[in-house]
């Protein structure tokens, strides 16, 4: 167990208070009328439920989605894999995070009156800065054919969601694509050209099928200013269309809270796009205050990753009971 450090605790409290004061000043200056997202990724929820976990708040059992809504959340994020049952897949037996499971979850989200962010991974398994593995069914295709598959997969998914009345309000074209996606074609090691061609096909499908959905480009560079600038300058150079910037922020990989704030402020000034910290695990109050304080109201929200996981989001314990951490959102 680590020794309690009063000075560190005091420093974080003072940081949060300062950011809250600034946020109140800026909040009336929003550049659009879109709702501020207090969001949760709950992509693990169906597996938990099928494993017998029942969720509760204050001893009262209920749907985890409803519990989150009743405690201040208004947005739910779901990841989508191309074929999680493939030999390379995330869920070879049950197919969690496939289209069928996503359709079922989307109904629950909309029935709860919440907004919906769909996260396309364009892989059969986890896509992140360290791996962006081509779906098994696409691995023998040419670059041009993979571009077409990105369009087809995005279009078919969104058409299925629209058909059941659960169109997403926001769409991520790729997950943590700091180093590209759909390697090797979309790697940015030597050039952004391949990635940008792939992104344009995903964006085209989103615009055609769900024109009211906002499009996010998501990188994992929370406190890394130089790398963030390199990425989004390339998006401008190659003419990739998007509406929002998404950042992941985990301190062990992405720097201090001060570095996160400095980077988000620099990005707001340089790109004039709304920004969301679309993945984080800890420090909600500080992160939320930073985002709310961004100039011109360009801070558009936060999403805690795996909110229902006792190991990650920690808003519920191993038995599914809401923890005290949930109180921070209900204010």
Which residues are covered by each model-predicted region?
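Hydrophobic faces of well-ordered beta-strands that scaffold small-molecule active sites
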Residues: 38-40, 76-78, 116-120, 169-173, ...
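Non-catalytic positions within long, well-ordered alpha-helices that form the structural scaffold/packing
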Residues: 69, 110, 162, 236-238, ...
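Active-site cleft segment of glycoside hydrolase catalytic domains centered on the general acid/base Glu
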Residues: 92, 97-101, 127-235, 240-242, ...
């Amino acid at each position: 167990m680590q020794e309690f450090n009063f000075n560190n605790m005091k420093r974080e409290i003072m940081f949060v208070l300062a950011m809250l004061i600034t946020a109140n000043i800026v909040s009336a200056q929003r550049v659009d009328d879109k709702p501020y997202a207090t969001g949760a990724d709950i992509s693990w929820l169906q597996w938990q439920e099928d494993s017998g976990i029942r969720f509760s708040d204050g001893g009262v059992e209920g749907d985890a989605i409803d519990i989150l809504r009743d405690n201040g959340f208004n947005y739910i994020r779901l990841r989508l894999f191309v074929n999680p049952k493939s030999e390379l897949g995330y869920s070879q037996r049950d197919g969690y995070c496939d289209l069928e499971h996503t359709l079922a979850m989307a109904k629950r989200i909309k029935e709860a009156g919440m907004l919906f962010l769909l996260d396309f991974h364009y892989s059969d398994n986890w896509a992140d800065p360290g791996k962006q593995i081509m779906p098994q069914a696409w691995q023998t295709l040419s670059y041009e054919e993979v571009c077409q598959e990105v369009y087809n997969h995005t279009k078919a998914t969104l058409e299925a969601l629209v058909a059941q009345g659960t169109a997403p309000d926001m769409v991520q074209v790729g997950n943590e694509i700091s180093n590209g996606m759909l390697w090797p074609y979309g790697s940015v090691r030597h050039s952004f050209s391949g990635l940008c061609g792939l992104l344009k096909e995903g964006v085209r499908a989103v615009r055609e099928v769900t024109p009211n959905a906002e499009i996010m480009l998501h990188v994992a560079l929370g406190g890394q200013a130089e790398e963030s600038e390199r990425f989004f300058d390339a998006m401008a150079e190659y003419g990739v269309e998007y509406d929002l910037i998404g950042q992941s922020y985990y301190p062990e990989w992405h720097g201090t809270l001060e570095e996160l704030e400095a980077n988000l402020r620099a990005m707001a000034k340089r790109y004039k796009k709304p920004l969301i910290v679309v993945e984080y695990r800890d420090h909600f109050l500080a992160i939320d205050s930073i985002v709310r304080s961004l100039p011109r109201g360009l801070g558009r929200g936060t999403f805690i990753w795996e909110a229902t996981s006792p190991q990650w989001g920690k808003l519920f314990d191993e038995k599914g009971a809401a923890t005290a951490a949930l109180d921070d959102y209900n204010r």
